[in-house]
C-alpha cells in the first residue's frame, strides 16, 4: 500500500506532542488521556516499623524537599540492617523524576536539546553518586523494573508507575504467589528547598483537567487514621503547588 502523511487535528498533552515531533510536525499520537504518574513508591509498613516519618505525610505538610529527603535517607540507613538500604531506584527513572520536581526541564523541544549539563541538574547526578558511594543506594539494583530486595522488604524507596501495583511481574499483589506482603506508599519526588508550597487548612475547590470543579471537604488522613495537622495544629486538606517550582515529569507543569 501507499502511505500518505496528511495534516490532522488532534488534541493531546503538549508534552506528548513535543516528544513525538520532528521539525515541528507531530507524527505520534497517544490514545486516551495522558496521566503522568511518575512517583516514588515505598515500603510504608517498614517505614512505620523503624519509626521514620511517612514521606506522604511530609509531602502534604509541604516539607518533602530535597534537603529533607537527604536527611530522611541518612536517618533511615542508621535504623536499617547492614544489608538493607533506603534507596532502591532505577538511575534513569530517578533523574527523570527528581530533576523536574526541583524545577528543571530536561528537554528543550524547540532547540532539540537535552539539558543534562545545567548545574542544577548535574548537582542531582552528583548527589545520586554520593548516595551510592556512601552506602544509601542498594548496589544490587540492576535493570529490572522492580528489584528482588524491594519485594523482599529489604529496601525502602523504589521507582515505579501506578500500573505496577496490580501487575504480577512488577509490584506483585499480595494475594498472588510471591506477592508483596507489605503496604506500599506513594509520594512525588522531593521539591526544591526554596519551592513555595501553600497548605490548605480548610475545605477548598479546584478545577480538574477536564474543566470540572472538584470540592475537597475531607481532611488528609495520616497513617494513624487521624486528620493530618500542621506544626501549629491546623487540619490539612491538601497542598497548592501553583506558586512552586515543582514540575510534573513529561508535562512541564505543576498540575
Predicted regions and their residues:
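Short, solvent-exposed loop/beta-turn-alpha elements that line the ligand-binding surface or hinge
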Residues: 1-11, 58-61, 104-123, 194-200
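Glycine-centered hinge/linker elements that transmit conformational signals in sensory
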Residues: 69-75, 109-142
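Hinge/lid segment of periplasmic solute-binding proteins
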Residues: 1-37, 197, 215-232
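Aromatic-glycine-rich donor-binding/catalytic loop that engages nucleotide-sugar donors
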Residues: 45-59
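Extracytoplasmic "Venus flytrap"/periplasmic binding protein-like
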Residues: 1-12, 49-50, 156-157, 176-179, ...
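Extracytoplasmic/periplasmic substrate-recognition and gating elements
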Residues: 175-255
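Extracytoplasmic/periplasmic solute-binding protein
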Residues: 16-40, 48, 65-114
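Short helices/loops that flank or line small-molecule/ion binding pockets
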Residues: 68-76, 144-158
Amino acid at each position: 500500500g501507499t502511505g500518505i502523511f496528511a495534516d490532522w487535528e488532534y488534541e493531546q498533552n503538549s508534552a506528548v506532542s513535543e516528544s513525538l515531533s520532528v521539525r515541528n510536525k507531530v507524527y505520534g499520537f497517544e490514545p486516551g488521556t495522558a496521566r503522568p504518574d511518575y512517583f516514588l513508591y515505598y515500603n510504608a509498613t517498614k517505614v512505620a516499623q523503624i519509626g521514620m516519618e511517612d514521606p506522604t505525610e511530609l509531602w502534604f505538610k509541604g516539607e518533602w524537599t530535597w534537603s529533607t529527603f537527604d536527611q530522611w535517607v541518612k536517618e533511615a540507613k542508621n535504623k536499617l540492617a547492614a544489608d538493607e538500604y533506603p534507596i532502591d531506584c532505577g538511575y534513569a527513572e530517578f533523574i527523570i523524576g527528581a530533576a523536574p520536581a526541583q524545577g528543571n526541564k530536561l528537554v528543550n523541544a524547540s532547540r532539540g536539546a537535552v539539558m543534562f549539563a545545567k548545574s542544577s541538574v548535574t548537582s542531582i547526578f552528583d548527589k545520586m553518586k554520593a548516595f551510592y558511594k556512601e552506602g544509601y543506594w542498594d548496589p544490587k539494583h540492576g535493570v529490572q523494573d522492580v528489584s528482588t530486595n524491594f519485594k523482599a522488604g529489604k529496601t525502602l524507596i523504589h521507582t515505579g508507575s501506578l500500573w505496577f501495583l496490580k501487575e504480577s511481574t512488577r509490584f506483585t499483589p499480595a494475594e498472588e504467589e510471591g506477592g508483596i506482603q507489605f503496604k506500599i506508599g506513594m509520594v512525588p519526588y522531593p521539591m526544591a528547598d526554596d519551592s513555595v508550597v501553600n497548605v490548605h487548612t480548610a475545605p477548598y475547590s479546584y478545577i480538574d483537567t477536564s474543566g470540572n470543579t472538584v470540592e475537597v471537604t475531607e481532611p488528609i488522613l495520616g497513617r494513624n487514621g487521624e486528620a493530618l495537622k500542621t506544626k501549629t495544629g491546623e487540619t490539612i486538606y491538601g497542598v497548592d503547588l501553583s506558586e512552586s517550582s515543582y514540575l510534573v515529569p513529561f508535562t512541564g507543569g505543576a498540575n
